Swiss-Prot record:
Residues 359-370 have a biased composition (Polar residues). GO terms for cellular component: axonemal dynein complex; axoneme; dynein axonemal particle; motile cilium. Keywords: Cell projection, Cilium, Cytoplasm, Cytoskeleton, Flagellum, Repeat, WD repeat. It comes from Homo sapiens (Human). This is Dynein axonemal intermediate chain 4.
Amino acid sequence: MTPGKHSGASARAANGGAWGYRDFRGGQKKGWCTTPQLVATMPVSPAGSHKQQNFGLNNATQPKKSISFFATMKATSVKGYTGANQSRMAVSKTVLIPPELKTVEKPNPNIKTTQVFDINGTDVTPRPLYHPDPLTGTAKPSKLLTSQEGSLGSEFISSYSLYQNTINPSTLGQFTRSVLGSSTVSKSSVSASESIAEDLEEPSYKRERLTSFTDLQVIRAAPEKIVTKEDLEKNIEIILTETETLRFFDLPTVMVSVESEEAEKVTQRNKNYEVLCRNRLGNDLYVERMMQTFNGAPKNKDVQCDKIIMEDKGIMSTAWDLYDSYNAMELVSLSVKQSVVESSSKANVLPKDQDQRLPGSTTEKNSETSSLMDIENVILAKIHEDEEDHSDAILKSDKFHQDLFFMERVLMENIFQPKLAAYRQLPVLKEPEPEEPEDVLESAKHEEVEEESKKEEEEEIHAEESTIPANLERLWSFSCDLTKGLNVSSLAWNKTNPDLLAVGYGHFGFKEQKRGLACCWSIKNPMWPERIYQSPYGVTAVDFSIGAPNLLAVGYHNGTIAIYNVRSNSNVPVLDSSESPQKHLGPVWQLQWIEQDRGTTGDGKREILVSISADGRISKWVIRKGLDCYDLMRLKRTTAASNKKGGEKEKKDEALISRQAPGMCFAFHPKDTNIYLAGTEEGHIHKCSCSYNEQYLDTYRGHKGPVYKVTWNPFCHDVFLSCSADWGVIIWQQENVKPSLSFYPATSVVYDVAWSPKSSYIFAAANENRVEIWDLHISTLDPLIVNTANPGIKFTTILFAKQTDCLLVGDSDGQVSVYELRNMPTVLETGRGDIMDTLLGSKSNQSA
């Protein structure tokens, strides 16, 4: 079939094209008829690709009528027509009618519609899927794809044929849904959903829709790139940049109130600082430079805590407690009964006529019961108050405090019984274990076996102790929370009660001064002191009186001397030298009570208090109406003896800042209390007499530093011992001004030395970091026992126990440790002084 040619065909195609019809009865292509009036031509494909076909319409069809579909629609290919491809496109479509079909148009003056009938006369007109709202106005054409109004050029036909032949349905469908569907459909037109019908009412509306299409641009999908192994191994550079700081919330801190007086000054300073920060950028006056800081290396330290002491507490209810409690309840019930009887007796006293007036009154009964309840409450409250007053009186009574005091001592003795037994050299008591009931014979045999085993164990222990060298075993320490961190400056035993110890706490250095403390400790209670005397100044010396053991003399770092009565619980001193015009101007380094003869005319002895201070004065204090002070000696600086040779001239003496030498220690002769030794800061030891206060009897030169302690030998009265800051300990003889024996065992300051009360050739020395026990009978080169201090702790004072083989050592942490001397060599009862004299006589000029 050749396509027909007619002049109206092109116009028809331009206006909207024709629309075709397929016969589904046999799947065969029907014949097509053409009319000379109207010919519809499909868009022509490129040459050689598809055949051009003409379709004719029935004569009954009205001229210039077409059906336009703007919704997305799927065109079904007709068998035998290669130009009809499947596509999804929002463009106008032409329906082709075969010649067998007849088109009949119903006359309607208002709305012109087109109906399609088959050969049998059946109406096969397609029904629209979308019914437009007649009340809605016509949609305006979109200007997105509009080229010119009222015309559709040949470019649209050519592009349409190109899409029909080359574009993939899936690609075109996506494009038409996103671009054409959204750009051409309005509220009054068809929607973007798929449809196969369109409104056929007004041709002007269709023409506006056709004129809105322009050339379509194809969006081709880029082919996916195949990723190879080389692409995976390539290095990908990712550059990270810092974004700007986003502040979600900024609340400036306010340190000064706006209403304060300093608000204006602070505001002005802030403004000046902001101006300074702004001017800093780009200013030549500011230079950036780097600084290196030193960071301390971290250290791992092990800390050992104190032993956690567990206590078992119990409550005992005795028979008299139960009796008192029950008796109190009976007293309450009796008092209530008595009140009830009294109220009833008062009611019986009333006249009979008053009782007969209100025989059945309930108000009287209620009032009587309420009054009885009130009386009971008052009685109970009064009893409770009496009990509280009674309990307060008991708790505040002196008898109760005394009972608690003794009870605490008993508990401490039970806890420290093994330690106290070792201190007093007594056997340790072991608690008997509970035994099951046995026969008498078996128990007796068992006891005999135990006694034999104990004897064997004791023999073995003695044999082992003979092989173990001498050592120090720590028993306990006098310390509490008040003394922790304070320096132990002095120790003193009570002259009458050997279980009472006075301890002074205070630092030696002027810049290290803290609060001072003087405590009286008892062996019966090592956990808490019996008396506590606090002071704002450090305590440097303490000593108990000989004639009045209850008097304790305390010297302070500010030069004050105070005397306390330890029998009283008062913390106020009985006497002090704070108001005395002769008080010391420097620290009182030593105090001692001395008994002296009253003179040739007087009988007996008198007791004086002697003190030495850093102001260069040795003073005695006499208790009369107050503390009267007299100077025994004013220590003067001495020049070293010049050893000039012949032809040498004497050098001029150096100018002295102070002509007085600070005194550090003193020691009175054990037999002749008129003679005493005084150690000075220069390193000299002066022998002085109480009868002469203008000059020294002798001067012992041997130390190169301050002399901290001088003490006489308790058995050889012509031998004394001294220690100094020059790391040395020297033994002197009274007749020889040169050292007899010198000991320099360590490179540390020796703060204190003490002779043993049981041996003339045993003494102890307290260095900064260790305690040494020397036995001159065994060796003069090495100490017999050495006990090292803990890290960071310094030993400051030392004192032997009077009646036991124990040693007390004070340190810089506020502890006074008690050590037992184990396996010491036996002490000869006779010839103590002879052995010392022989030792010093043979080695008088030997230095160790």
